[in-house]
Amino acid sequence: MLYLKRKIDAFLSEWKENPDKKPLIVKGPRQVGKTESIQRFAAENYTSVITINFVEEPKYKMITADGYKAADIIKNISRIDPSKRFIEDETLIFFDELQEFPDIATALKFFKIDGRFDVICSGSMLGLNYRKIESNSVGYKTDYEMFSLDFEEFLWAGGYDDAFIDDMLTHMRTLTPFNELEMSVCGELFLNYCILGGMPAVVREFIEKGTFEGSLETQRQLISDYREDIRKYADGMDQTRILNVFQHIPVQLAKDNKKFQISKVASGARFRDYRGCIEWLNDAGMVNICYCLNFPELPLKGNYDETKYKLYFADSGLLVAMLDEEAQEDLRANKNLGVYKGALYENVVGEALVKAGYQLYYYKREDSTLEQDFFVRTASALIPVEVKAQRGTAKSLRTLITSDKYEDIHYGIKFTAGNVGFSDDIYTFPYFCAFLLKRYLAGEQSEKL
């Protein structure tokens, strides 16, 4: 089976080399490749790998019966399976499906103190168990959050190397337009990524076949699996509410005003009744929440209204798959999704920002037409980010930059179908450069220091 190179690969290697490393918890949505990446790393770096999957082998939930000390847990694992070999300094213990047995997180402190074996846990943050994991292991773990493939990892899967990606970043930093061939190649690759998304099963199938055949079916199976997870892990009556919110995301993104309106989900629905449902979907890694700023100024944290927000899919390919039967074909053939076109590009850029480490914020002033898609920040500036599905003047972006009201804003970023450019303090880049924004801004900051 084709292995997809992931960013976690380099992180795992660095983690192993750290002499003072803590047990590692790899979190992330279902089916984004956590187990596969960890198992590959383990096989290449350890003499012995002890894999405990709490879903496939629930009997291992008994290993804490005598307490949480490393020696007691190792003894109980050996009682269940005497063939497992624990070799000091050469063994990785891999606890998979952590959400099924969050109790094991309590043992991480004792494995850190013991120090003889490396420990990695992996789990999907479904239901309330992730909070139990946090409280059980605070101070004695390292966290890594994994997502579906970003566009850079998608390029790796297609055989493009770091030099290709570095060249894209150079175009941004030097404000050098891409030539016709580069625009065509990068644009087609990005369109493929928009259609497919980054779920490993979908990307692998596309790379191996070289066509979109079967991709829609795979995406829809993933959506079906997500719905089943909601039914399995969500409590009681929240199941129906969570499913209703999940189903309504594409419809609400198609509106001119993309603010998510709970009142559209069910008759008489109120935010306070659905707040936990929104948080559940976000914590499970199924959606990204974009909160409305009270005012576009620093700092961002605490400066937003939690009752006003947009909901984006954490993987844009799943958004496409939830549209009508012709959506994928229409996007490939006509490059046109009608009312959904703007929603798709917003979703893809928002997804890229989250995968780069940003939290999502937007701004809409109630008494005017002023509205801005996203905001990111550097150490000293607030940067509005515009996503234009069609060529336009970006009036809100210009207002934010030129008005004296917004002291933290000095320039803006616009992502479009067009080429690299700069005018009136607005930097314009193609959509396919969105994944590089954080690196671009880091370079801008270092030049000013």
Describe the predicted segments one by one.
Residues K34:
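Conserved lysine of the Walker
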Residues V26:
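Hydrophobic anchor at the beta1->P-loop junction of P-loop NTPases
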Residues M199, R204-A379:
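Accessory nucleic acid-recognition modules appended to NTPase machines
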Residues D118-S124, E145:
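Structural recognition of the conserved hydrophobic beta-strand(s) that form the central parallel beta-sheet
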Residues M1-W15:
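N-terminal pre-Walker A segment at the start of P-loop NTPase domains
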Residues E56-D89:
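Short glycine-rich substrate-engagement loop in P-loop NTPases that contacts/grips substrate
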Residues S37, F41:
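Hydrophobic positions on the alpha1 helix immediately C-terminal to the Walker A/P-loop
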Residues K132-A254:
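Interdomain motor-coupling "hinge/lid" segment immediately C-terminal to the ATP-binding subdomain
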